[in-house]
Amino acid sequence: MSIKYVFLISRQAKLRLAKWYSTLSPKDKQKTVKEVGQIVLQRKPKQCNFIEHRDTKVVYRKYASLYFIAGIDLDDNELLVLEIIHRYVEVLDRAFGNVCELDLIFNFQKAYFVLDEMVCAGELLEPSKPTVLRCLAQMDETEAAENADRGWADINLEGVAKTAMLTVQEFKQSFSR
């Protein structure tokens, strides 16, 4: 099985995450995201989650307001890719506690890290949720130690938001504008 790309788009067709496992020019990548995104967003919920686009089979699944999309070879197993997507979402749910679009916007590095732990060069590398979560916990510990060394350990979004008289969500939204 060879995954060519994985990307996440919102209902508004905004790209939230993109990982490419095959070589394409930036123009071709942008064209693929636009075309596949439009096709997927126009499909009805009861329609099949597999479509063919050029020389690729597109497998997608919607979770809340996000579409998780993967492009694979035409002869690859679509159900296996759906399971990989589901496993990825399960790990993100455990990592973020019911993952949402804002989690992916503000913690995109974790989303990429989890994907990199699970898929390498387009092949499923680590299917075990506990193993991926353990690696993520180690990364968080390392990051916390590095931040403590820099004096950033005590930065608290809630405290900053209260000082500005905003909710944490309003505070996060002010950065997305």
Residue ranges, per PLM feature:
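Intrinsically disordered, Ser/Thr-rich regulatory regions of eukaryotic membrane-trafficking proteins
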Residues: 1-177
